[in-house]
UniProtKB/Swiss-Prot annotation:
Matching PANTHER family: ABC TRANSPORTER PERMEASE PROTEIN YPHD-RELATED-RELATED, GALACTOSE_METHYL GALACTOSIDE IMPORT PERMEASE PROTEIN MGLC
Subunit: The complex is composed of one ATP-binding protein (MglA), two transmembrane proteins (MglC) and a solute-binding protein (MglB).
GO molecular function: transmembrane transporter activity
Organism: Treponema pallidum (strain Nichols)
Family listed: Belongs to the binding-protein-dependent transport system permease family. AraH/RbsC subfamily.
InterPro entries on file: ABC_transp_permease (IPR001851)
Record keywords: Cell membrane, Membrane, Sugar transport, Transmembrane, Transmembrane helix, Transport
Matching Pfam families: BPD_transp_2 (PF02653)
Protein name: Galactose/methyl galactoside import permease protein MglC
Topology versus the membrane: Multi-pass membrane protein
Main location class: membrane
One GO CC annotation: plasma membrane
Amino acid sequence: MRDRTQCVAVPTQAFNEILDQDGQLTAYAQRLEQLRERGSHRVALLRGELARIRQDQVLGMPEKRVQVAAHRLKISEAQAVARQCKTEETQLVRKAVARVRGLFRDFDCSVRDAMREQRLLLKQVATVQHTSASSDQREHCLAQLRQCKEARHHAYRSLVEKSAALRNGKMTFIERVVRALREYSFNFDATQFFLANGLYIAIAVFFIACIVVAPFSGNGNLLTIPNILTILEQSSVRMFYAVGVAGIILLAGTDLSIGRMVAMGSVVTGIILHPGQNIVTFFGLGPWDFTPVPMAVRVVMSLAVSVALCVSFSLFAGFFSARLKIHPFISTLATQLIIYGVLFFGTSGTPVGSIDPYIKDLFGGRWILGTMQGTLVTFPKLIIPATIAVAIAWFIWNKTILGKNMYAVGGNAEAANVSGISVFGVTMSVFAMAAVFYGFGAFFETFKANASAGTGQGYELDAIASCVVGGISFNGGIGKLEGAVVGVIIFTGLTYCLTFLGIDTNLQFVFKGLIIIAAVALDSVKYLKRR
């Protein structure tokens, strides 16, 4: 009868020792090496030498041609030997691989027997009264189970590696897939998985439920191309705000002035692009009429002024945070109030009116793609600039020195300063970069609705929430830009789905609040676990 407990203490390399000590397997491997020495191995060696000869800059062309011809002849001879040995080699490989698998089955069976025994012991320990000795025995059983699990994992890895070596380095597709699955299963941690993906799983279930319920609500099918494109269109402009504030959150900060900056840029854009004389005055100045100015100049002017104003106010807030160490929550709150007061008092809250219809269609219109099942399908133009903005931001985050420094400063500002990184410079750069995205977003916001001092109300909360849901930590130094993008789409899709199903607008805030608190709670748990 097999001694089961002996297998429990087998080290993780025990199966390798079994393979090395098996005489029959060693004989197979030696014979295969002999067959390949003058065949496939020699072909590979000669091809390597041939490549070096061709790249040699010292050899003259006549000498190089002679050596190339000689090596080609040797390669042909080695290939002929390999073909002669092919049948015997194939049979040996089949027998050797079968031998390895047989040894693995025996080893795996013995380890599984030991694991069953340890599980039985654990059950017995659980039934007895809790004492110090029983606690020690339980820990011992758990340690033995972990050791057995590692032994099985390393044994299977050795099985695949040995089989590939016997096949001269070749691995079957099935072996690759099974090995990947077993590696994932071995390293899988349910707690970490649900901490990282639990919120997304819950949101995915919610969206699936909405898709299933929608036809029964009498509102039609939710999962259609026009609806998806509408969600992406509504996400496009808000993508600028989330991408901008994401950098500030990465520095363990926040920005409460987004909505007011959007209003400021939108009002300026609306005034400049309005057809004819505008009714809006600013501190008694105006009204203005920019129609004599060429349209291209007006577009560039409105965009430049929107970006310049946003950058100015953002740098104002950033200076107090970077130089005086005032938390961005306070500095951006002050900026928000300043912009709101100046803008509302200066314009009396008067809407700027519509903008030139040609420009509105040029930037904010749609391209007609055709019809699908009797429904006209159009592609929103706003998706294009949003995609470009995300691509530029991704490049800055991942491919530039500023991006690397953002993670360093966000993770530990003091350590970054000691290592020679200018914390002040990085902070100011991030605030300026965020403002550029706000300015562009405010410019495109004008094409959605008439701008006024109240435009953008609450946008900062949606942008910040999108970043948090996307995995950008408030603790700083953790997160990816892609997360902010996904967060924007999730929140926009959530609002669209609830509206599509006829859910009251006020009740939608409840769903948003639950998602935000869940995201922040999971982020806090992950942060505490890392500490």
